[in-house]
C-alpha cells in the first residue's frame, strides 16, 4: 500500500510517535493538550492498554479507508464497529464501517442504528476501531485515543455495551478494554 511505503520511506514508522503539541497553547486549549499528553504517557508506558503491530482485520479496514480517500493526501478518520457472536461450532463477526471524506466525519455516518440491531439480536459489541492517520505536523498519527475519543467510547460502552477500543495509525494499534480506559482523561 502506498501509504505504508511512503511512511517507511520517510523513516516515520514509529511505534510511539511524539505528540505534536502546538506551541503557545493557553487556557482551556492548554488543558486539553496536557490531558492528551497524560493519556499518551499512560499508553506508551503500558499502564493503560497495549500498543502493538496492526492486526490483519484492522489493516484491512484501514486499507479500505485509504482506498476511499488517500490518507497521505487527505487524512480522514473512520470508525469501524466490530461485533461478534459465537457458539461451540463457530464464531462470527460483523463489521459496521462508517466514514466520510472529511477529516472529522459526523457521527451520523457511523452506523449505530445497525450496531443497535445486531446488539438486539444477541451480538456482542466486541470493539471499535478508530484511526489517527497523520498529525497536523505531518508526523505519523498517535495510536492512542484522544480525550474526545475517550469520552465518546465511554458513551458507547454505557449505551451499547462496547467491550474494547482500538486506535490505529496504519502501522500500530492501541488496544484496551473499556475498564482500563477509566485511567484516561476525557474531554
Positions of predicted regions on the chain:
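Glycine-rich short-loop/terminal segments
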Residues: 1-121
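Active-site-proximal loop/helix of nucleotide/amide-processing enzymes and allied scaffolds
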Residues: 1-31, 109-187
Amino acid at each position: 500500500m502506498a501509504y505504508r511505503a511512503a511512511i517507511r520511506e520517510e523513516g516515520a514508522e514509529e511505534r510511539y510517535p511524539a505528540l505534536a503539541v502546538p506551541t503557545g497553547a493557553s487556557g482551556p486549549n492548554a488543558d486539553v493538550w496536557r490531558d492528551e499528553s497524560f493519556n499518551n504517557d499512560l499508553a506508551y508506558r503500558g499502564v493503560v492498554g497495549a500498543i502493538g503491530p496492526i492486526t490483519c482485520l484492522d489493516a484491512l479496514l484501514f486499507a479500505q479507508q485509504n482506498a476511499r480517500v488517500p490518507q497521505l493526501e487527505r487524512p480522514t478518520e473512520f470508525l469501524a464497529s466490530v461485533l461478534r457472536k459465537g457458539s461451540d461450532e463457530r464464531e462470527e463477526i460483523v463489521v459496521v464501517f462508517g466514514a466520510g471524506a472529511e477529516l472529522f466525519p459526523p457521527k451520523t455516518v457511523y452506523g449505530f442504528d445497525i450496531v443497535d440491531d445486531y446488539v438486539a439480536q444477541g451480538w456482542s459489541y466486541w470493539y471499535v476501531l478508530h484511526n489517527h492517520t497523520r498529525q497536523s505536523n505531518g508526523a505519523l498519527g498517535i495510536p492512542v485515543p484522544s480525550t474526545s475519543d475517550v469520552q465518546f467510547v465511554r458513551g458507547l460502552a454505557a449505551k451499547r455495551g462496547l467491550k474494547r477500543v482500538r486506535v490505529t495509525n496504519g502501522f500500530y494499534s492501541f488496544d484496551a478494554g473499556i475498564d482500563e480506559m477509566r485511567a484516561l482523561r476525557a474531554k
